[in-house]
A protein has these predicted regions:
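Hydrophobic alpha-helical transmembrane segments of multi-pass membrane transport/permease proteins
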Residues: 25-49, 74-78, 183-193, 269
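Hydrophobic/aromatic residues in alpha-helical transmembrane segments
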Residues: 81-85, 133, 165, 271, ...
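Helix-loop-helix units of permease transmembrane domains in multi-pass membrane transporters
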Residues: 13, 88-121
């Protein structure tokens, strides 16, 4: 059995999958996830039908509905992921089972990745279970399958990054409650804080300089690329962001999703590396 097979097929991962999916509460959670997303989408659809042309929903309103559903799903993912991942290692420590886990033949890399995969697999099931809801969008047109794939790509990468941060905090912080708080604080800084900084300080810079140059452009870009909702809108409505980032003497600007993908992959790799190194702080890592 090669190293890659051992990494993804191991007793730790099998045990976590059984614990995660054998409970009725897990499926009840997915039901309420879809209920909230579907109910909000139907409500927004009703609003669009009232303000649409002659009370009907066309392709333009359908696109607005798709953006609303994508942003709603990012919001649900952002607030559910810390709760699922921030107690993966600290919970074992509090139950006094971590030392037993560390005496097994599983490497630090295998343990960390198994905990992450098992936690995020639950959210992946919830995300893909929402696909039938998007039939409402395809019913009226205005959205291509590429847009759906791009939206799901942003959601999955957001989930992976926040989940990696949760596992990292769970490894370096002994108490689960503090780990959860730290993960939520970091998530809020990425999802909300970055956009607030641009709104507050960006307007100040523009107020002092009526002809902003590349400095202001990159200031806005570097902070907005960390914000998943903003990146989603930039992917689905590129013309809006082309106008926003256009500066005299510059092109429309580097696509926001490029910075998002690179930065979030970097955060994910760094978080997992720290977690792997800190899992066995007093001994040489075996993974």
């Amino acid at each position: 059995m090669n190293r890659l097979t051992i990494l993804f097929i191991n007793p730790v991962l099998n045990k976590e999958f059984k614990l995660r999916f054998r409970s009725f509460k897990s499926y009840l959670g997915i039901f309420f996830y879809l209920l909230v997303l579907g109910g909000a989408s139907l409500g927004f659809m009703g609003i669009l039908s009232q303000v649409g042309r002659i009370g009907n929903i066309g392709s333009e309103e359908s696109r607005y509905l798709f953006i609303f559903m994508s942003l709603g799903q990012i919001g649900l993912i952002s607030f559910m992921t810390p709760g699922l991942t921030a107690g993966t290692i600290s919970g074992e420590r509090e139950r006094q089972t971590l030392n037993i886990l560390l005496t097994t033949q599983q490497s630090s890399t295998t343990i960390i990745l198994s905990k992450l995969i098992s936690s995020l697999s639950y959210l992946l099931v919830a995300i893909f279970s929402s696909l039938p809801l998007y039939s409402l969008v395809f019913l009226y047109g205005g959205v291509s399958p590429i847009s759906v794939l791009a939206s799901f790509g942003v959601q999955i990468l957001t989930m992976l990054t926040i989940g990696s941060l949760g596992v990292m905090f769970s490894t370096i912080i002994r108490r689960t409650m503090i780990s959860v708080i730290a993960t939520y604080a970091t998530m809020l800084a990425l999802v909300i804080g970055a956009a607030l900084i641009v709104l507050l300080f960006g307007s100040i810079l523009l107020g002092y300089n009526q002809n902003p140059g590349s400095g202001v452009f990159w200031f806005r870009y570097l902070f907005l690329m960390l914000n998943p909702p903003v990146v989603t809108i930039s992917v689905l409505e590129p013309q809006f962001f082309s106008q926003m980032f256009y500066q005299p003497g510059h092109a429309a600007g580097t696509s926001l999703w490029i910075g998002f993908v690179l930065s979030y992959i970097g955060i994910t790799i760094l978080s997992l590396w720290i977690a792997i190194q800190k899992l066995r702080p007093k001994m040489k890592s075996r993974g």
